């Protein structure tokens, strides 16, 4: 089952998907984990689909198969490290009866340690505008747990055309990082009608802003535990937005109130988040 979820019934609204998953498993059925067991028990794939490559992260070797990397042959206490990129995740989703909540429950059954989990929300309707977000930040109309952010404006040297717009909250090593960027510019498909149609972009009003939430270590594991819990009734997008709501909001200035946290939330942000609830990442164990 695809995790690409339409958050509203209309076309060109918002889509939410898991876009990265990294985890480490040390034992399977009481014995040291092996790459073969990761393939058969966790991924449920065939050995023949993988080729051997040089390792990384302290592992001597890795097995690779189109967006899926299994790092092995490290120190005895390192276990096996599984890394699934966005392309690999789309591959797994295309399998019959596949779901990420079941995948994660199975991984937790083998005492997996989730080390990174990325969630992407694609706004193809026009709720988020990169120039508006930058203007809000410049005017101090952003309330956040993050102390700083950095903005990147990428241009083509040949003619000065804008080639990319990005805002980062947090660093690459932060346990929580947000990245908002113009996916249409990043993909370079703003004038390619065929590719826009393939990516479900409104040709008459092309818009594609991606909001990426990158979680690491405890935050990644806690989010995965929530999502894998059979008692959880929230869709992926609802969960992600509640986490975002706990870290970030854009507001409208009020000259009569110096407390920025009391300023009214900007309408565009209210429409994008679509919830007043917040999700604080505290642990709860899922049921098998």
Residue positions per predicted region:
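Structured, helix-rich domain cores that form ligand/interaction pockets
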Residues: 1-286
